[in-house]
């Protein structure tokens, strides 16, 4: 009589928050799959549902609690992890029947909780997992986390209390992971960390052997190594330290994309001081000018906080004037929101909500004007574009070097019947609006 093999439990996953949390989810699922667990995208088919939460601001916490509530209603067997897991009592008050709660980066605790909730009889099946691990992004791009935590103590932020101080990964381990991703079809590597430009500080910029040379735990050396793998390399969360200047020649060489995501947060010296952000806004403008002298087409993205406690109309106007000079390609903005545990909560000079909203609108209007002018200047030019979507009716959408997934603009193509997701093609730009480009593929 043939013995029937046991059926492996199925795990569902809801991943919320930033790309760094997405990488955490990928790591957890890779581990569980390697042990033989199956994965399910349906609540009613899963034996256990994992909810990886965000706990940075109140709106994100509410979104996480809503997701937990949905998982409880649709399935009932739920394990919570991620940043909101640090507030276990709050979660238990609303959902007393949660199976287990763990905090951010507590990978072993999550896996152990799954073992308790849905024991698996099979032996580990490492061959069930592709060499590059499991991914939650499309095949053609991947987030590559190079560090965890942050050494800064910005007054509006609680990341260090959620994720700890800076912990950098070994340079050789990062390059090995990136090489596997590229071999598996990744065309674009999105480098992330809480503070990517601080990479390697905790390792004292130690050198590691990578193939036939030594690679330093330093963002510039690491970026060079990544650029040699043949994929697009896009740098995110780059704090504007002086050594960031060393990345610009790599862009000029074509090793990494001419794109930097730099969270300036504000420009007014008084606001930056209260935020505990040491950047000098005048020197930053000088550096942007020098970067553009080396790489004229460099795309610069940043995010800003409006309505920070004590922000005056003069401070805000300073920011708008600074944006006129900086001419950033992509801008995101957030209305200040008190975060439990942040020092800024105790600051005087709270800005009324209606003023925050009005300033937010003015900032985004300014950013849109700048963006539209810069995109209009690209009409008639040919740009490389990576394809993200096809519509089956001859249309396609993708992104240029100046566009990160989900947060920046897109390039919309006509007559794109022969294009596939992940293709990198040359597009002639025919039109533009405030955020997107429109054109036709030449190759």
UniProtKB/Swiss-Prot annotation:
- For whether the record's keyword set contains 4Fe-4S, the answer is yes
| GO biological process terms on file | tRNA modification
Q: What class of enzyme is it?
A: transferase
EC code(s) of this entry: 2.8.4.4
So which cofactors does this thing need? [4Fe-4S] cluster
Which PROSITE patterns does the UniProt record give? MTTASE_N, MTTASE_RADICAL, RADICAL_SAM, TRAM
For binding [4Fe-4S] cluster 1, which residues are annotated in this chain's numbering?
Answer: 18, 54, 83
The domain of life is Bacteria
Q: Which Pfam families match?
A: Radical_SAM, TRAM_2, UPF0004
Q: Name one GO cellular component term.
A: cytosol
InterPro entries the UniProt entry points to: Elp3/MiaA/NifB-like_rSAM, Methylthiotransferase, Methylthiotransferase_CS, Methylthiotransferase_N, Methylthiotransferase_N_sf, NA-bd_OB-fold, Ribosomal_uS12_MeSTrfase_RimO, rSAM
- Compartment(s) where it occurs, according to its Swiss-Prot or TrEMBL record: Cytoplasm
Reaction(s) catalysed by this chain, per the record, are:
L-aspartate(89)-[ribosomal protein uS12]-hydrogen + (sulfur carrier)-SH + AH2 + 2 S-adenosyl-L-methionine = 3-methylsulfanyl-L-aspartate(89)-[ribosomal protein uS12]-hydrogen + (sulfur carrier)-H + 5'-deoxyadenosine + L-methionine + A + S-adenosyl-L-homocysteine + 2 H(+)
Tell me which Gene3D superfamilies the record gives: Methylthiotransferase, N-terminal domain, Nucleic acid-binding proteins, tm_1862 like domain
Q: Which residues form the Radical SAM core domain?
A: 136-373
Keywords carried by this UniProt record = 4Fe-4S, Cytoplasm, Iron, Iron-sulfur, Metal-binding, S-adenosyl-L-methionine, Transferase
Which GO terms of the molecular function aspect are on file? Answer: 4 iron, 4 sulfur cluster binding; aspartic acid methylthiotransferase activity; metal ion binding; protein methylthiotransferase activity
Q: Which residues bind [4Fe-4S] cluster 2?
A: 150, 154, 157
Specify the TRAM domain's residue ranges. Answer: 376-443
Q: Which SUPFAM superfamilies match?
A: Radical SAM enzymes (SSF102114)
| UniProt similarity note | Belongs to the methylthiotransferase family. RimO subfamily.
Function field: Catalyzes the methylthiolation of an aspartic acid residue of ribosomal protein uS12.
- Descriptive protein name: Ribosomal protein uS12 methylthiotransferase RimO
**High-level lineage:** Bacteria, Pseudomonadati, Pseudomonadota, Alphaproteobacteria, Sphingomonadales
Q: Which gene encodes it?
A: rimO
């Amino acid at each position: 009589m043939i013995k029937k093999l046991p059926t492996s439990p199925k795990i569902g996953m809801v991943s919320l928050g930033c790309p760094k949390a997405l990488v955490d989810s990928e790591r957890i699922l890779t581990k569980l799959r390697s042990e033989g667990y199956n994965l399910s995208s349906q609540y009613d088919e899963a034996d256990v549902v994992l909810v990886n939460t965000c706990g940075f601001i109140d709106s994100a916490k509410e979104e996480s609690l809503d997701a937990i509530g949905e998982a409880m209603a649709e399935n009932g067997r739920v394990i919570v992890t991620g940043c909101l897991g640090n507030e276990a009592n709050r979660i238990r008050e609303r959902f007393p029947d949660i199976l287990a709660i763990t905090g951010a980066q507590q990978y072993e605790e999550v896996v152990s909780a799954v073992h308790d909730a849905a024991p698996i009889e099979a032996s580990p099946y490492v061959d069930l997992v592709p060499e590059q691990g499991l991914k939650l992004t499309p095949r053609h791009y991947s987030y590559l986390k190079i560090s965890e935590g942050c050494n800064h103590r910005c007054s509006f932020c609680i990341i260090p209390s959620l994720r700890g101080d800076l912990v950098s990964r070994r340079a050789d381990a990062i390059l090995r992971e990136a090489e596997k991703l590229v071999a598996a079809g990744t065309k674009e590597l999105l480098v992330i960390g809480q503070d990517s430009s601080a990479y390697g500080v905790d390792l004292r910029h130690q050198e590691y052997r990578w193939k036939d040379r030594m690679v330093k735990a330093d963002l510039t050396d690491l970026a060079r190594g990544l650029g040699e793998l043949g994929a697009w390399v896009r740098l995110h969360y780059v704090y504007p330290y002086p050594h960031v200047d060393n990345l610009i020649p790599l862009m000029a060489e074509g090793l990494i994309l001419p794109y930097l995501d730099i969270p300036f947060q504000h420009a007014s010296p008084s606001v930056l001081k209260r935020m505990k952000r040491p950047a000098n806004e005048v020197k930053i403008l000088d550096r942007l000018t020098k970067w553009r002298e080396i790489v004229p087409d460099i795309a610069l993205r940043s995010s800003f906080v409006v309505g920070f406690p004590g922000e005056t109309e003069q401070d805000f106007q300073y920011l708008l004037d600074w944006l006129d000079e900086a001419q950033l390609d992509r801008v995101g903005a957030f209305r200040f929101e008190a975060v439990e545990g942040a020092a800024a909560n105790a600051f005087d000079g709270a800005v009324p909500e209606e003023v925050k909203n009005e300033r937010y609108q003015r900032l985004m209007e300014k950013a849109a004007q700048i963006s539209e002018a810069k995109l209009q200047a690209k009409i008639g030019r040919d740009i490389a574009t990576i394809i993200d979507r096809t519509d089956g009716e001859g249309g396609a959408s993708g992104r240029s070097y100046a566009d990160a997934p989900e947060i920046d603009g897109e390039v919309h193509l006509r007559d794109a019947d022969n294009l596939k997701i992940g293709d990198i093609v040359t597009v002639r730009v025919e039109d533009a609006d405030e955020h997107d480009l429109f054109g036709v593929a030449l190759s």
